[in-house]
Amino acid sequence: MKVHFDRTYNHPMEAVWAALTDARAIRQWWVDTDFRAEPGHEFFFRDKPQGKWDGVVRGRVLEVEPGRRVRFTWDGGGHQTVVEFRLEPAEGGGTRLLLSHDGFRGLSGLFLATMLRFGWGKYVNTILPETAKHLADKGFGVPFDRPSKAATVGIAASA
């Protein structure tokens, strides 16, 4: 089973890439992390624990085409899956994001994929484009207009 999103944003590829791959931006729109878009880098994504899940997803960056594509493992919720973000110039300007999250197996994989489809949808439709817009308009030098996602769920940001 696969989770897939195809979205177009009216923001430059550089801003969308930064929103997806720079830990400072990821903390803003998603979760606490030490992510770096470098092949072989092992990282974590830390969210608020829920039920038996400790809130931590671990992964390793598999492939990077700087500014265009990053592919990494996702080890969380009892499943090992693979996520890919691919960016393309959009017709008429802006950036097209193709997100795929693949490798879900069995009934528990179906359940996890359903939950992640909801979560990814929320992020790619609202918070990610807001973050990319901020980066395109103001960069990292100007504080974001709202608290980071990591802060709103009570997660202390990493250095």
Q: Predicted segments — roles?
A:
Residues 14, 68, 126:
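Glycine-centered loop/turn positions within well-structured domains
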Residues 11, 52, 56, 111-115:
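Residues at secondary-structure transition points
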Residues 31-35, 41-44, 49-94, 100-105:
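Hydrophobic-ligand binding "helix-grip"
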Residues 1-34, 153-159:
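Hydrophobic ligand-binding cavity/cleft-lining segments
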Residues 17-20, 29-30, 74, 85, ...:
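Tryptophan-centric aromatic hotspots in well-structured domains and transmembrane helices
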Residues 103-159:
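A conserved amphipathic terminal alpha-helix motif
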